[in-house]
Regions:
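Bacterial N-terminal signal peptides that target proteins for export
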Residues: 2-21
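C-terminal motif of bacterial Sec signal peptides marking the signal peptidase cleavage site
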Residues: 28-32
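Exported/periplasmic ABC-transporter solute-binding proteins
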Residues: 33-87, 91-282
Length: 282
């Protein structure tokens, strides 16, 4: 009988020990899960904003080795949607928010110019706003109509949902539609590469992404420079936004605060962007 009682006591102790271990492990897992949002974040959206966000993230992670920031593209609309569905913590947008998106928290991180680019072999240096609209509406179809050599104009445009396309449509096209004959690309880099490879192509990209293998055109005889964007003489400019579903917290807030800090703004200025008014106020 005594042996049976001892065995029962031993079993109860074992069960108690196992329960304590399980509880400890469970608490540890809960703690780890609750800490995950603090140490990792996903940022998705505009391919115009993406390269600058990558520069900011690289610097932030160098200063804060425990942080993990994953930057993804997809376009402005995709980034905003990802924020709404919580598949991304922060959305990147290079267009203004639509009415049904304005409930989202957002902040301007910088301003950017939009430029028309052609191949360096193209002799054209300047186009008017009307000429650009007519090119993209396919009313003007040959470079000879603009003083260039007789060659068909190959029109390169961004995809629907792109903030770059949205800004171009609003600022240049107005009520006109971009021709369905345009070659559609899903990133600034892809547009730039096609123009670099084709002497008869024209495209539009972010000012900060212009490289030596393409030529930026003057618009209405005004050069696309940071100074001309700031003084308003060059009118093709837009906001770069970070968007979150509600007031940002944890790592999201820390990264956004870093972006708007003097150090973050300096990084963006060095890359050719115009500092944010939000950042200037800090």
């Amino acid at each position: 009988m005594r042996k049976k009682i001892v065995t029962c006591k031993l079993l109860r102790r074992i069960r108690g020990t196992i329960s304590a271990v399980i509880l400890t492990l469970s608490m540890g897992m809960l703690t780890a899960c609750s800490q995950a949002p603090e140490s990792a974040t996903i940022i998705a959206g505009s391919t115009s904003v993406q390269p600058y966000a990558e520069i900011l993230a690289e610097e932030y992670m160098a200063l804060n080795p425990e942080a993990v920031i994953d930057i993804q593209g997809g376009g402005s609309s995709a980034g905003i949607t990802a924020t709404q569905t919580h598949s991304a913590n922060i959305g990147m947008s290079s267009r203004a928010l639509k009415d049904d998106e304005k409930k989202l928290w957002n902040v301007e991180i910088a301003k950017d110019g939009l430029v028309l680019i052609v191949n360096p072999k193209n002799p054209i240096q300047n186009l008017t706003s009307d000429q650009i609209r007519d090119i993209y509406a396919a009313t003007i179809t040959d470079w000879s109509q603009l003083g260039g050599t007789k060659s068909k104009i190959n029109i390169i445009a961004r995809e629907e949902g792109s903030g770059t396309r949205s800004a171009f449509t609003e600022l240049i096209m107005g009520e006109e539609e971009i021709t369905p004959k345009a070659i559609v690309q899903d990133s600034n880099g892809a547009v730039r590469q096609l123009v670099a490879d084709d002497p008869n192509a024209i495209g539009f990209i972010s000012l900060g992404l212009v490289t030596d293998d393409v030529k930026a055109l003057h618009l209405d005889s005004i050069e696309a420079t940071r100074e001309n964007i700031m003084n308003g003489s060059y009118r093709l400019s837009r906001q770069f936004l970070f968007v979150t579903d509600g007031e940002p917290i944890g790592l999201d807030k820390k990264f956004i605060d870093f972006t708007l800090s003097s150090e973050g703004q300096r990084l963006l200025i060095n890359e050719g962007l115009i500092p944010s008014e939000e950042g200037a106020e800090k």
